């Protein structure tokens, strides 16, 4: 709402000085999505549109200006949830962390070449077993999903609980990779 008010007040000031009320504004993008279960649920594109429309109407009414045509660039909130990347498990390695705890490293057939975001700036994702139902008796194990590249930073999912019976050949799904996964891939 604050950004809408700032843009419309600037539009009003420019019109007062120059005599021309800009007929269109672009409110940009940056509308978030949830990448993991720990992320807050983001508003839908429709909810964002309603909030922006109300802010435009209210601010224009306050200023006595004709409302402009409004453009937005919702990119990530539309594209992000639209893609799930599937990886095949190629290896497993259990590492003792001390005090009776361990982490299972789950190697996959992809990595930083198809999703650089975790390595580049620490973007967080989650992973789910997609190829079969796990054995409920196997419980969950703390895992780190790592890529196929010979780089210490090739981590796709830093910490995720996966079924204890995960095996080579299983398929993992990494949701919400549609916004930048493919466009930043090499």
Where are the regions a protein language model picked out?
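Charged (often Lys/Glu-rich) extended helix/loop segments that serve as interaction or gating elements
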Residues: 51, 57-61, 65-186
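Active-site loop/helix belt of alpha/beta enzymes
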Residues: 1-93
């Amino acid at each position: 709402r604050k950004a809408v008010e700032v843009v419309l007040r600037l539009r009003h000031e420019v019109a007062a000085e120059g005599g021309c009320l800009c007929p269109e504004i672009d409110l940009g993008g940056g509308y978030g999505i949830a990448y993991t279960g720990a992320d807050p649920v983001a508003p839908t594109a429709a909810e964002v549109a309603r909030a922006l429309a109300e802010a435009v109407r209210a601010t224009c009414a306050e200023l006595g200006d004709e409302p402009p045509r409004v453009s937005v660039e919702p990119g990530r909130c539309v594209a992000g949830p639209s893609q799930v990347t599937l990886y095949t498990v190629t290896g497993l390695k259990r590492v003792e962390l001390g005090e009776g705890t361990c982490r299972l490293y789950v190697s996959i057939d992809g990595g930083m070449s198809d999703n650089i975001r975790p390595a580049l700036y620490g973007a967080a994702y989650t992973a789910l077993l997609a190829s079969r139902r796990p054995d409920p008796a196997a419980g969950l194990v703390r895992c780190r999903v790592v890529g196929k590249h010979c780089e210490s930073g090739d981590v796709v999912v830093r910490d995720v609980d996966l079924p204890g019976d995960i095996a080579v050949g299983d398929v993992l799904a990494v949701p919400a990779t549609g916004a930048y996964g493919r466009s930043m891939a090499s």
